[in-house]
Amino acid sequence: MKNKKLLVMAGGTGGHVFPAIAVAQTLQKQEWDICWLGTKDRMEAQLVPKYGIPIRFIQISGLRGKGIKALLNAPFAIFRAVLQAKKIIQEEKPDAVLGMGGYVSGPAGVAAKLCGVPIILHEQNAIAGLTNKLLGKIATCVLQAFPTAFPHAEVVGNPVREDLFEMPNPDIRFSDREEKLRVLVVGGSQGARVLNHTLPKVVTQLADKLEFRHQVGKGAVEEVSQLYGENLEQVKITEFIDNMAEAYAWADVVICRSGALTVCEIAAVGAAAIFVPFQHKDRQQYLNAKYLSDVGAAKIIEQADLTPEMLVNYLKNLTRENLLQMALKAKTMSMPNAAQRVAEVIKQYSN
């Protein structure tokens, strides 16, 4: 009997691509064939084939920040992308499509509707993006990571890597720690400039009390090392973190942005967090962070309010007992079966 096939529509950022890979891998274990639809100039083009998943491409890009010519050309570009996606769907003959966000999802979702293929949509953020708001009107089923994106959609969490759920619980990790508090600063693949410029001034005042690791992002090691100056020996600086599970396990508290995937990873491992949301006009990252801050698992510091003095005052008053309680609260908010649940819904609607 022929294997069932899923077409994944996701691209642009790790927040869209990594959860989609987790779902794809879950279905691959159940003997599903997977095909991916993306764009050639975004991260999925290099990343997805590394997981042994074939990828095909359509031409589409975002409009934010583009000039008037691009806006005038947009209807033609979208129409062309829909036709490209429709042709690929007719060739691949998937039993279902999974939309996980990114520019590619819009035209590909419309094409799937035209081809009569079930559309399962997953919104990773606490507030839905424009593409998913529109696709939500034609999707067969809508799922969401947080309870605030769609009024009636099932909340399943964000699929995150299995190794994060396999870590020891916070009370076990914290049980034999008596040395300095450990602070992990995570800027993401591009780094977070505000963290890179603020933390060196914080370490100047707290190097004798706290231990720091700082992931600074692509190409930023030299600049940030200079900012740390004579305190550089007090900090472990890296461009990327290859083993996030080990880094989270090491930390007592994590300072980071609050992208959807990051928030769900923090919950999965059970870690105390200080979130500095990126300043989207739709407050997307702030609302993601509230999911944990509302239960006392995290502190939110708005970027406009972030100063070295403020961060120093907050950090120096933390105790390991406080942080353990925050970590335990974060763990209660995790949804370890997110990838499995999304896979179940796909199977349900593909029959």
UniProtKB/Swiss-Prot annotation:
EC number of this enzyme: 2.4.1.227
Pathway(s): Cell wall biogenesis; peptidoglycan biosynthesis
Cell division keyword on record: yes
Entries under CDD domains matching the protein: GT28_MurG
InterPro entries hit by this protein: GlcNAc_MurG (IPR006009), Glyco_trans_28_C (IPR007235), GlycoTrans_28_N (IPR004276)
Pfam family, one: Glyco_tran_28_C
Highest rank taxon of the organism: Bacteria
UniProt catalytic activity: di-trans,octa-cis-undecaprenyl diphospho-N-acetyl-alpha-D-muramoyl-L-alanyl-D-glutamyl-meso-2,6-diaminopimeloyl-D-alanyl-D-alanine + UDP-N-acetyl-alpha-D-glucosamine = di-trans,octa-cis-undecaprenyl diphospho-[N-acetyl-alpha-D-glucosaminyl-(1->4)]-N-acetyl-alpha-D-muramoyl-L-alanyl-D-glutamyl-meso-2,6-diaminopimeloyl-D-alanyl-D-alanine + UDP + H(+)
Keywords: Cell cycle, Cell division, Cell inner membrane, Cell membrane, Cell shape, Cell wall biogenesis/degradation, Glycosyltransferase, Membrane, Peptidoglycan synthesis, Transferase
Cited Gene3D superfamilies: Glycogen Phosphorylase B
Keyword Ion transport part of the UniProt annotation: no
EC class: transferase
Protein's job: Cell wall formation. Catalyzes the transfer of a GlcNAc subunit on undecaprenyl-pyrophosphoryl-MurNAc-pentapeptide (lipid intermediate I) to form undecaprenyl-pyrophosphoryl-MurNAc-(pentapeptide)GlcNAc (lipid intermediate II).
PANTHER family documented for this protein: GLYCOSYLTRANSFERASE, UDP-N-ACETYLGLUCOSAMINE--N-ACETYLMURAMYL-(PENTAPEPTIDE) PYROPHOSPHORYL-UNDECAPRENOL N-ACETYLGLUCOSAMINE TRANSFERASE 1
Family: Belongs to the glycosyltransferase 28 family. MurG subfamily.
The protein's name: UDP-N-acetylglucosamine--N-acetylmuramyl-(pentapeptide) pyrophosphoryl-undecaprenol N-acetylglucosamine transferase
